[in-house]
């Protein structure tokens, strides 16, 4: 791929692969349903479900600020036509069709609270609205008679208005000490969510020491009830229609108490448990029908002989389907998996410097439908699968972004980058700082000391000229994180690149 600012890269896919090529009839978000505009004349951009051609259209800066933790790396997402940039300070929204529609929702409202973790922004539908969901790990030093406590905060934000529609704060621990390293301080391990309801399960671990044990737990939160439930000793893998799938057990290599389970989110009651006679399985991903885990156990510990599998747990029946790795066992460490919010799960092997594997699973059955390895010959396993959406897999090879059919694993042909940069019509006008009418209501906007203010879209002056695979996708396009470059980058932590859907 040509790395020059005068070149716009585009991925062109053939019709009939990985879903319908039909252009969406409405300004839909994730799910193809119409969305009520913030104003009657709110502008929209073309949408395709799923996007099958992507072109760089905008760059949104994520400003650095004094005191930022080295762990606070901006995370990108997209909900409907709003690009999302999240971090410890809060969540920024940039309407890709209307640069005047920008907002920032802070992660905390009390001076006694510090933030030590943030999830990536997640996109969901709540009451037909495109909503961003984000979770934070926080430490509150207490006030008056209140003891210091560890909190998990979940926010749901209407992306077209920049208003919070729900918020749930859940105390999960008592702190001994101050700061993010205090005993009892919560850390986010993973998140699982339901894109159809906005329900979320947050995996949490707490810091321990020789006298205070570390805890593992899941926090289930629902935007409709604005209530939460704590489920001890569980790491979540999937949430769908109020049902949580998760794993529990010991991490010791010789452990045999590893179990996968189903639970009711509202009550926290475990409804089904399936012992696997191995160490605790690793949650991978969740679809509408199944939750996915990776597990391994030694058959001869002294000889280092083990067997492993991907387990698909039916969210309704509790039935389990196993998929064995295609690689030799010595080359298998684990998998990273992504659900396409339709009927497919795509997984790639991780953690080894040897052979690599990619495979697809049918979420309807939980069974493997395709796959190949770097030993197969003739095909390259992508370096990273960055996103999957409605039948299309978005991935990055060493040379360029690529796309695969999520159901078959077949390549979706791409064209060479077109010459010339994006036209002025491709990029929103220079951004403006949100006015009081653009931003969230009083109490939703941070003070100057809370977070730097993103100054909106700066055109493509921050784009480095090399298009990459998006990490999040909606019918309007996708986003990815780019490191800042150039003379104007010293005050930036990163740049959010928006690639619009053109087909």
Predicted feature residues:
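Aromatic (tryptophan-biased) beta-strands that constitute blades/sheets of beta-rich domains
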Residues: 29-75, 80-86, 90-118, 161-179, ...
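Beta-propeller blade signature
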Residues: 149-162, 214-222, 258-264, 307-318, ...
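Loop/turn-rich, solvent-exposed surfaces of beta-rich toroidal or solenoidal domains
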Residues: 332-360, 367-421
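Short, solvent-exposed loop/turn segments at conserved positions within beta-propeller repeat blades
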Residues: 84-86, 143-151, 209-215, 251-258, ...
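C-terminal motif of bacterial Sec signal peptides marking the signal peptidase cleavage site
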Residues: 12-16
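Bacterial lipoprotein signal-peptidase II cleavage site
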Residues: 17-31
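Repeated scaffold domains used in trafficking and secretory/extracellular systems
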Residues: 64-80, 110-126, 170-193, 230-248, ...
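Long, acidic/polar, low-complexity amphipathic helices and coiled-coil-like
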Residues: 93, 98-289
């Amino acid at each position: 791929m040509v790395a020059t600012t005068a070149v716009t890269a585009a991925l062109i896919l053939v019709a009939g692969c990985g879903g319908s090529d039909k252009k969406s009839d409405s300004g839909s978000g994730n799910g193809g349903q119409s969305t009520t505009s913030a104003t009657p004349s709110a502008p929209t951009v073309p949408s395709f479900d799923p996007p099958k051609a992507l072109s760089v259209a905008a760059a949104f800066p994520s400003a650095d600020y004094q005191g930022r933790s080295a762990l606070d790396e901006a995370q990108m997402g997209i909900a409907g036509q709003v690009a999302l940039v999240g971090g410890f300070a809060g969540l920024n929204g940039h309407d890709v069709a209307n640069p005047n529609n920008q907002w920032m929702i802070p992660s905390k409202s009390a001076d006694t609270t510090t933030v030590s973790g943030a999830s990536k922004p997640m996109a969901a539908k709540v009451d037909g609205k495109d909503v961003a969901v984000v979770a934070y790990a926080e430490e509150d030093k207490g006030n008056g008679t209140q003891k210091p406590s560890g909190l998990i905060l979940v926010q749901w934000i209407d992306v077209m208005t920049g208003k919070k529609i729900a918020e749930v704060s859940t105390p999960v621990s008592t702190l001994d000490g101050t700061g993010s390293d205090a005993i009892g301080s919560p850390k986010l391990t993973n998140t699982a969510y339901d894109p159809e309801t906005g329900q979320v399960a947050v995996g949490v671990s707490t810091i321990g020491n020789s006298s205070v044990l570390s805890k593992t737990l899941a926090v289930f939160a629902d935007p409709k009830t604005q209530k939460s439930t704590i489920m001890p000793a569980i790491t979540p893998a999937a949430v769908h229609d109020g049902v949580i799938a998760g794993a529990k057990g010991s991490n010791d290599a010789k452990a045999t108490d590893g179990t996968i389970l189903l639970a009711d989110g509202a009550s926290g009651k475990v409804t089904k448990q399936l012992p696997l006679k191995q160490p605790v399985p690793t949650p991978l991903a969740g679809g509408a029908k199944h939750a996915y885990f990776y597990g391994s156990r030694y058959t001869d510990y002294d000889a280092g002989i083990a067997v492993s599998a991907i387990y698909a747990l039916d969210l309704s029946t509790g039935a389990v389907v196993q998929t064995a790795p295609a690689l030799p066992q010595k080359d298998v460490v684990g998998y990273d998996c992504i659900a396409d919010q339709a009927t497919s799960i795509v997984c790639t092997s991780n953690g080894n410097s040897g052979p690599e594997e990619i495979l697809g699973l049918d979420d309807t059955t939980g069974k493997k439908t395709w796959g190949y390895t770097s030993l197969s010959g003739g095909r390259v396993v992508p370096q990273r699968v960055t996103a999957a959406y409605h039948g299309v897999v978005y991935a990055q090879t060493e040379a360029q972004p690529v796309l695969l059919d999520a159901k078959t694993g077949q390549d979706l042909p791409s064209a060479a980058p077109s010459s010339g940069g994006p036209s002025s019509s491709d990029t929103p006008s220079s951004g403006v700082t949100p006015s009081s009418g653009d931003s969230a209501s009083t109490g939703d906007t941070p003070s100057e000391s809370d977070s730097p203010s993103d100054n909106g879209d700066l055109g493509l002056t921050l784009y480095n000229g090399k298009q990459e695979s998006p990490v999040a996708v909606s019918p309007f396009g996708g986003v990815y994180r780019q490191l800042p470059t150039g003379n104007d980058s010293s005050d930036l932590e990163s740049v959010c690149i928006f690639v619009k859907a053109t087909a």
